């Protein structure tokens, strides 16, 4: 009798183990599969340059990212590439991706929907128009709502296309013509992060994560580190270093030699991260408005003057006007976003302010708290442009 019970118990254990392995296999996410990358849907995708690494098993997922039903709602996965930690992003919710596919098929009058053919139809239709291919107009007809398309210009579109094509040629990427345009269109419409990381690359000094490549509907970028929310109660020296870099980021995006101003429309504390060497980077670049300053100067009707952000906030959000950003040669928006949004007490993403508890001796010698408040709530128009360089100089002297 006891022997029979042992056999039954052992059988049950074996069955449970088999079921467990099957369930683990079912719930397991395989990054090398077409189901994960959707590379078969290109050119309705972000690119294909990193596909060999995916298909050869050089990219693996870490932790709960391995499990199908515990994935991030935004489709963000932690992984490894050549023993380096990386972040894999599909850059949208599943529902957003499905809605974009439907939009593209509807615009191409394609039913049943085959989104890769829809993209080819839309691109070829515009390529066939002699001497009048205006990619900007194509984007407009598709009712894009991404921030990067809010202030469109032919120079910006050409710049983005040239940057992506140049990087494809460096890796001997095939069909950089209509196929590349399809990928550019798809990224601009759904989420332009991959495009921005390539066009404004870290190698050229921009404060963004390194873009490592893409396969289908997945991009891969470097894992930077913990977000700045982790450092909110760190020692003063470390916090002032981070604040200094945040203002440098705001300054570079606003005032640079590219002819483009990049305005951050989402500056919450989880959108900035700190590398192991202490470097601060903007790690979520989906919400960036790009203004072509050169193009504006050619327009006789544009407002050839600076724009002042008034700082009218709603709870936990940044209140601004796309028209104001698009139609002025320069705005203090980035300074307003960092100072009012993160640094001062009662900022909307840091109630006590990232620069809380400034040492008394520092305040006495530098008047830093007053200057940061002036950046957040200026007493005169455009004073942020005058006060930010002073703040940066003081912070640099404290490091």
What are these regions (language model features)?
Residues 86, 207, 219, 281-284:
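Protein kinase-like catalytic core scaffold
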Residues 197-202, 212, 247-254, 283, ...:
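Amphipathic alpha-helical interaction motifs in eukaryotic regulatory proteins
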Residues 83-86, 92-96, 216-218, 225-226, ...:
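Conserved beta-strand elements of beta-rich interaction domains across eukaryotes
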Residues 258-329:
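Catalytic activation segment of kinase domains across protein kinase-like and atypical kinase folds
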Residues 2-43, 312-399:
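Helical subdomain adjoining the active site within ATP-dependent kinase catalytic cores
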Residues 232-268, 275:
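Conserved alphaE helix
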Residues 119-194, 198, 206-249, 292-294:
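Conserved structural core of kinase catalytic domains
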Residues 6-84, 90-143, 177-189:
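Juxta-kinase regulatory segment immediately upstream of eukaryotic protein kinase catalytic domains
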């Amino acid at each position: 009798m006891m022997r029979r019970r042992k056999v039954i118990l052992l059988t049950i254990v074996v069955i449970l183990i088999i079921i467990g392995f099957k369930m683990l296999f079912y719930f397991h996410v395989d990054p090398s599969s077409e189901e994960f990358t959707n590379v078969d849907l290109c050119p309705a995708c972000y690119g294909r340059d990193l596909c060999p690494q995916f298909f050869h098993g050089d990219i693996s997922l870490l932790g709960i990212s391995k499990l199908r039903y515990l994935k991030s709602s935004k489709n963000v996965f932690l992984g490894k590439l050549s023993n380096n930690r990386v972040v894999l992003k599909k850059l949208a919710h599943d529902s957003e991706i499905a809605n974009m596919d439907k939009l593209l098929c509807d615009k191409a009058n394609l039913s049943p929907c085959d989104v890769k053919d829809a993209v080819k139809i839309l691109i070829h239709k515009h390529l066939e128009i002699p001497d009048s291919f205006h990619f900007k107009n194509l984007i407009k007809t598709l009712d894009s709502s991404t921030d990067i398309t809010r202030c469109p210009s032919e120079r910006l579109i050409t710049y983005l296309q040239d940057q992506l094509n140049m990087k494809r040629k460096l890796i001997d990427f095939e069909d950089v013509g209509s196929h590349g345009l399809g990928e550019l269109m798809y990224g601009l419409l759904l989420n332009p992060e991959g495009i921005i990381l390539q066009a404004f690359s870290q190698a050229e000094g921009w404060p963004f994560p390194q873009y490592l490549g893409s396969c289908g509907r997945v991009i891969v970028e470097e894992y930077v580190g913990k977000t700045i929310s982790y450092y909110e109660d760190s020692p003063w020296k470390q916090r002032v270093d981070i604040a200094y870099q945040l203002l440098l980021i705001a300054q570079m995006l606003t005032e640079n030699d590219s002819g483009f101003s990049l305005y951050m429309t989402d500056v919450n504390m989880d959108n900035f991260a700190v590398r192991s060497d202490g470097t601060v980077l903007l790690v979520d670049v989906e919400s960036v408005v790009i203004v072509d300053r050169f193009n504006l100067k050619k327009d006789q009707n544009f407002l050839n003057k600076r724009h002042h952000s008034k700082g009218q906030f709603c709870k936990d959000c940044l209140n601004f006007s796309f028209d104001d950003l698009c139609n002025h040669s320069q705005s203090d928006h980035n300074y307003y976003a960092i100072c009012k949004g993160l640094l001062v007490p009662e900022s909307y993403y840091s109630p006590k302010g990232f620069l809380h508890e400034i040492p008394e001796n520092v305040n006495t010698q530098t008047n830093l708290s007053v200057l940061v408040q002036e950046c957040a709530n200026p007493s005169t128009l455009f004073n942020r442009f005058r006060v930010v360089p002073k703040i940066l100089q003081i912070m640099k002297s404290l490091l």
